[in-house]
Amino acid sequence: MNVAGIYIDSLSVHSIWGVAGGNRLVNPHENYKSRDMILSLDDKVSPLQGHSFSRQGSHKVCSNFLPWICSNKTWGLGKSETIADHALEFYLVDLFAQIPHEAKVAFSLPLYLTPKQTRRIEQIASKIGMQVQGSLTSASALALGAIRKSQTSSNCLAVELDGFGLSLSHVQVAEGVPHLLAGKVFPEFGLHRWVLKLADFIAEKAILHCRKDPRVKPDTDQALFLQAQKLMANIGTKVSFKVVLEEEFWSQEFVITQTDLKKCFSGLFSALKLQLNDFIQHKITTRDDIHLALAHNLGGVPGLTSLLVQDNSGASYHTHSPEDLFHQSFICSNAMTMAGQWWLDSVGASSVVQYRNPIGASKV
């Protein structure tokens, strides 16, 4: 029997599949698919790669739509108008074509989604023909991976980051079953906030050097955002980065160093440190032998992993690669398939109800 795990956050969707009962995937790269979730709404609905396109506005692109599942919020105008439910269906149809249609499917979903939104995602998947077994929070999937790798702790602080926000979750794993004990989402620390902060920092350097604001013209502003995004994605690979801004009759180059990055993000880090300490103090009753499970994209924010480790001195930690998290989706799907109805409640609702607290953040 084939089983599949699908991991979704506000920026991307990923799937991985294999044979039930196997602990490892034989060909993980062949069975793994990933797509950015951003749709062009110009002439026809079509997918785009690269989240810099999100700067074009909600009338031209549909992006960061996952938090708005089950809502009437619209993107686009006229015939190209769409809602989050339809946008997600577009990507699930695309993924469904890449996995065996008889596969049993489970989802790993962000903490901020409510049970109602989770059920809606499962309904959309069932509508297109997927055999949905249930869902877990991606924090639970992270915790399962962390405990499996460390073998030292059953308590886990899972930290995730996407376009909507930064999520903190306290998960306890007992006899292989994850229990979400506490969680909080901080929209003010979403990935786009860090990218915009860096873009503004570079723009201010341009004003200081040549008295020209690159944010005034849309094309230059888009180029600025794109380079800031690329810089964030490669933040740990170099000690400095070159940024080039060009317009007709004007060009400027800058070198951004690690010292610049520290200065740029100091305010965000100070605010995050306060929130992190407050969460740990009030939501985690015991800090003995707790394990940190850090989502892969936290590495795109310089110093964030160090901050989390320093604030949990003595804790072991593991930073998950994308494949780790998606492999956990596969394990969850495998477990659900083999456990059968044990994972379902009396009315057939998904297993997410057993683990999820109604914690979701306000989507103002």
Describe every region a protein language model picked out.
Residues 12-14, 22-108, 235-239, 272, ...:
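Conserved phosphate-binding loops in N-terminal lobes of ATP-dependent enzymes
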Residues 84-146:
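Active-site neighborhood for divalent-cation/phosphate handling
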Residues 92-105, 206-217, 272-291:
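Phosphate/pyrophosphate-binding loops at sites that engage ATP/ADP/AMP, CoA/4′-phosphopantetheine
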Residues 173-258:
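Phosphate-binding glycine-rich/basic clefts of nucleotide- and phosphate-handling proteins
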